[in-house]
Amino acid sequence: MTLKSLPAWTALQSHFEQIRHARLRDWFAPENDRAPTRAERFTIPGGGLAADFSKNRIDDETVRLLVQLARDAGVEARRDAMFAGEIVNPTEGRAALHTALRATDPQAPFHAQVSAERAKMATFARAVRSGTWTGYTGKRIRHVINIGIGGSDLGPKMVVHALHHVATPEISTHFVSNVDGADLARVLEQVDPEETLAIIVSKTFTTLETMTNARSLRDWFVARGCPEDALAKHFVGVSANPAEVVKFGIAADNVFEMWDWVGGRYSLWSAVGLSIMIAVGPEQFDELLAGANDMDRHFREAPLERNLPVLLGLIGIWYRNFFGSQSYLVAPYSEALHYLPSYLQQLEMESNGKSARLDGTFVDYPTSAVTWGEPGTNGQHAFFQMLHQGPTIVPIDFIAVLTPEHPLASHHPKLLANCFAQSEALMLGRTLEEARKVAGPGKEALAPHLTFPGNRPTTTLLVDALTPRALGALIALYEHKVLVQATVWDINPFDQWGVELGKILGKVVEADLSAESVDPAKHDSSTTALIERARAALKR
């Protein structure tokens, strides 16, 4: 049965026509918002977090029908299959067991293997943090460079930045991902090779960007005096292909394993998170895992009507497939969460930016929305104008951390006030009549410019404090949201074939850039012309 033929989908279409012009302002009006209030009904705790869904264009019937859609689409069955280690990535014939990386149950899949690798990580991290692991001249490590791309970069970078307040001040962590040499060059300007440890992270250990940077970094060490037989003091590898790591020149004892049953964008909980563990310590890393496990349990045990990942995913479908929203915004009012939007871009769009159903037929409905964002309050001075007064409706996830993780506590009420006021303003708007009063006598022409449509939907996620445990729960919340949406859309969120074609053609173009001549029959005229211009520039 296809999505559009499900009874709940048909019922939602009828319900949408009934509710599409309803005003949030009216639902919140005192005469309508009686106990239990709308905020009380639609604010739901889970996994140590809380979500206020009340400023969304939903009512109790919307939630009932969306939950029925989840049941009809098999969300519970697919969730349980994922946790059980069944094949939920059929195009690659793999399980998706990122949840096993933070499971505490000894009966969880691969528990012994995961525990052993984490213990090895902890031993190494403690040695680096304590100074007992030194560089080739005996100096302690003061800089860690994580080289990886995609899931081997975005997750660890996001977490290390978010948990800066609990990280050791003795070690600076740097992240290099781009094959553009400027990325690595800028980091190398800041570090001393005698005090630097490189973590090379690649599932296959053949990734173009990662291996290009790794080779350049190895050459840099040697050029600055590190003997080749001492590179083992400065290089470790994280991969599902240990043989290739050793072939690169990294000592076998310095190889940490990841597994093919963990997708890259879900892998920060594994040895891919070694840079996190070195920065914050094994105990705090365990807290990060514990928070994710809290959300895993909530996802498995909470009824769908009170289940944060389920509701977050279903409300996203409500806007994407019924209101026709093409993008959605993540606005963390926390500078510590600066990299969360870019992390979620990969998690959401690489997972659910698909057109092929699980049975190989193609969808006739939209899937992943464009995911974007910027921390508050910066975004208010960039794109919030469009959110408030533009013709396009963009659903928003606000994320508010209620207590600061820094000593400048007097800033925090201002930050929270802006977050809450933005959600209120987007919901309320300002009518033309109200705008006329604001404009004042004799300024009637200004009034239309002072109107706000309002009725703009937002969810506010509340985090008491940005502890490692709370951060783990927040990340897992979005991981599971992605699964919920993928299940309803009947797509595979665990592969990423869309990145392959460009990589294949990229090798052809790279060869042509250094060839004596380019066969115009190999490419379209635009690509041929671009190659020729680049060839001329590279020869200068």
Swiss-Prot record:
Its EC number is 5.3.1.9. It is an enzyme of class 5 (isomerase). It is found in: Cytoplasm. It catalyses: alpha-D-glucose 6-phosphate = beta-D-fructose 6-phosphate. One of its GO terms (biological process) is glucose 6-phosphate metabolic process. Transmembrane segments: none annotated. The active site is at residues 350, 381, 503. Belongs to the GPI family. This is Glucose-6-phosphate isomerase. The gene is pgi.
